[in-house]
Amino acid sequence: MKLKSLLLRYYPPGIMLEYETNGELKTKSIDLLELDPSTDVGALVEEIQKAEPLITASRAEKVRLLVQRLQAKLEQNSKHIFCLVKVLRAHILPLTNVALNKSGSCFITGSYDRMCKVWDTRSGEQLHTLEGHRNVVYTIAFNNPYGDKIATGSFDKTCKLWSAETGECYHTFRGHTAEIVCLSFNPQSTLVATGSMDTTAKLWDIQSGEEVFTLTGHLAEIISLSFDTSGSRIITGSFDHTVIVWDTSTARKVHTLIGHCAEISSSVFNWDCSLILTGSMDKTCMLWDATNGKCIATLTGHDDEILDSCFDYAGKLFATASADGTARVYCTATRKCISKLEGHEGEISKISFNPQGNRLLTGSSDKTARIWDAHTGECLQVLEGHVDEIFSCTFNYKGNIVITGSKDNTCRIWC
Amino acid sequence: MGLLSILRKLKSAPDQEVRILLLGLDNAGKTTLLKQLASEDISHITPTQGFNIKSVQSQGFKLNVWDIGGQRKIRPYWRNYFENTDILIYVIDSADRKRFEETGQELAELLEEEKLSCVPVLIFANKQDLLTAAPASEIAEGLNLHTIRDRVWQIQSCSALTGEGVQDGMNWVCKNVNAKKK
């Protein structure tokens, strides 16, 4: 085995090793999920050396520099103050969701006006209009990290796959018998998964445009789905109060997570795929062992339905957003609530961490989005200006751009 | 509200929930009517550029009322909201005689929609507080409502501003939902 090169992954922090074995080029990653600004780099490098034979003594200095770079990246943009740079009168009807490509150079908006539009983030210029759906474009996604394709899921029961560069429609995926309300590309960007009000999810082949599998088993609408980091499993969250873990290569049910006593609102894996976090209308969120499907913890405290939940990129923290107008941040290891985000004057329907994991972004029916310190719960900024409730908000991968989409038919770019 | 609540209101409603679609030309008074139903302040109402949704309890039902903007350029999108509609409420500005033909046309097109077939329709002859308002009987005749045979219908004069007649209309709604849901 011969090490060829070392590459960095900023968020979550990791070092990719490209190495040669029997004439074949392979890669593996050293995940540094515990890395934080106070980590003793010297000790960490020693640990890496012990665990990874490819990192020989001669490479140690190089690795030390890389870890320091990763450490610096975790603090990058942490003092960033967001300013409104553009208001885009994007659609003639309310927006649904927004999504950025990995570099943040462009983003997409879906709307009740049946269109998806592609925008240049810097100039605010409209690059493409993706037209063809016959009803609300509800769920949208880029195939990040590549960013050359866009998938749109509509109330017209179809999903369309588009070229992000030309706006050309490659495929229309037909087969669902009710509204498509969630979708995701797998990490390899070979499949699109769609979840529907028809109680099924489907996997589609991007190349051929054919249906690969139908995931049948839920008893009510599927409203959330996500792949794990490797793409080998997918979870679906349903109004039937359960979450199902599926094997994507066979469409077999691996586990059914039973425990919530009301509709599921969100379901996600952490980065290393050891845990699943679910939020529910029953006002609780639950942590599950992804390997055996057992519930590890039930987190109570919210006074109303949980509308969204998420892990940070490394999986060290997770957060919940509630109709009670507050959000909470928990430490994954201890499952203790470390901060409460209080200040919104309406329900919080969206929550996400910045990739560095030290900030949170929330979107609310009070027409504002807010930026919070993840550790102290202090509200750092109120992004004001929308004249109707915010339906969606998102950070870019660098954590220095925020896009908000609203029922007021506009989207706003904050940098 | 949030997108998730919209999805919850989208699915076919359980027995005690009723999905009501509120349509009509711009300036007919749909949003005022919606706010009147929800007992909210009606002093600052601007043209609806999208939609408003409110849930009101009435006679043991939870009425989920969808108020959809009526401007010409967004009327083609009304059909986004047709799915699972239990009752259609069509609102007319009874004082705007110049637009009776236009409103009649839109109503006729709605009644042709497959997804709304057999859905009971209540027509509110709104703005009866205005002196120039045409009476409900005149509107019924002008719009040829008596030719509607594929569903139950009713015309009710009202003033969304004062609230007069609104409850009578909603009583009719509940009565006809009863018939449908049982």
From Swiss-Prot, chain B:
GO molecular function: GDP binding; GTP binding; GTPase activity; metal ion binding; microtubule binding
Binding annotation for GTP: 24-31, 48, 67-71, 126-129, 159-161
CDD domains xrefs: Arl3
SUPFAM superfamilies listed in its UniProt record: P-loop containing nucleoside triphosphate hydrolases
Residues bearing PTM Phosphoserine: 5
Residues with lipidation of kind N-myristoyl glycine: 2
Gene3D superfamilies to which the protein is assigned, alphabetical: P-loop containing nucleotide triphosphate hydrolases
Positions with a binding annotation for Mg(2+): 31, 48
Domain of life: Eukaryota
Keyword Magnesium included in the entry's annotation: yes
Record keywords: Cell cycle, Cell division, Cell projection, Cytoplasm, Cytoskeleton, Golgi apparatus, GTP-binding, Lipoprotein, Magnesium, Membrane, Metal-binding, Myristate, Nucleotide-binding, Nucleus, Phosphoprotein, Protein transport, Transport
Any one GO BP annotation for this protein: cilium assembly
Family classification: Belongs to the small GTPase superfamily. Arf family.
Protein name stated in the entry: ADP-ribosylation factor-like protein 3
Gene source species: Sus scrofa
Native organism taxonomy: Eukaryota, Metazoa, Chordata, Craniata, Vertebrata
Gene: ARL3
